[in-house]
Each structure stands twice: as C-alpha cells, then as structure tokens.
Amino acid sequence: MKMTHRGCARIGVRAVVAGALLMSAVASAAAQNEGTTIRFKGGIGVIPVSAGVVDNGTATGATTAAPVASDVTRNIVRGVQPAGQIWVIDDLDAKVRANGRITVEGKGLILGGGNNAGRAAGQSVFATLICQATPPFTESSTNLAGVLLPTNGDFKIDDQLQPPPPAICASPMLLIRNAAVNPVTGNVWFAVGIFRPDND
C-alpha cells in the first residue's frame, strides 16, 4: 500500500502526541513521588529540664544561697534524650518528600548557656523524623555522621532518611540531634522543628 505524504504526517503527529502524553504521565508520577509531604517551619531550642521539685538545700559552692531541685523531669521527646545544656535556634525550614528525601536549613543553632553560650562549639548535627505519637517509636534519620555546625550555628542538610518514613506520617516530629554519641544518653536533641500541617 502506498503511503501518502498526508498519511505520513498524520502518523507523525499521533506519535508526537502519544510521546508527549507519555512524558507528561511520567513527569506527573515523578512529581508526586518528589512532592513535599511534610513541612516544618521554625524551630525551638532544647531546654534540658521540663519540670523540677525544689528542696530546702542550697547550691554547693554558691556565693549566694539558692534553692536546688532534688527531682527533675528531663525533656525527653519520643524517647530521645535532651542535651545537657540549653540551645537556641533562630530559624528552621525543613521539607520531607514522599520518597524520603529531606532538606533542612537551620539558622543560629547555638548554645544558650554555659561557658560557650552564644556560639556552637564544634558540634555536628543530623536530623531525625519520628511519625509515631506513642511508643514504639521508629527513628528515620539522615547520615549519623552529621554536618558540622560553624560558630554561628547555620547549617544545611540534604539527605535521604533511613529507614524511609511510612507512607502516612501520622504525627510528624523532627529533631535536630548531636552526632556525638553520649554513652548514657545517646544522640541527644538540640532543637525541634515546628510542624506545618498545611505545608504553608
């Protein structure tokens, strides 16, 4: 059968349209896979103690008598111990994709007390996402080696969470943690992200 120029043109147009539709479908699937599913905007630095009971004693060696807490409640978040000193953070912006990719940008994560207050002191940090509100908790974390905090506390993380978080993260909690392992308290947390349920 002899093919006319018009027939060839029609076949060519159909092929182009079919190819465009296929590419659009692939791009749409990829976009859904890469789409932002969880967003955190803003952060709160750790205060190591969340409650305490004051007794009638005084601080040992203090020049002025001061009450001391004989019983304190550590600020443990979903099984993760707090740092031993106060930390503050100016800003935090984090996005978690459906495929487990996470980007975190933090500003001013520095010590809020002690002899190194007002700066970071050589710590490295990583991010942990926890999706369960009650035990047992599963920690999905970036590389445990972490990224180095400069003196001003600004940092960026661009990594893959391992293990991957569940498809539905019922109660998202993002912790920024110390990469150095304490033999007693493990990888303590320095800051927590503020969850934005509307991805705003």
Name each region found by the language model.
Residues 96-105:
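Contiguous beta-strand segments within globular domains
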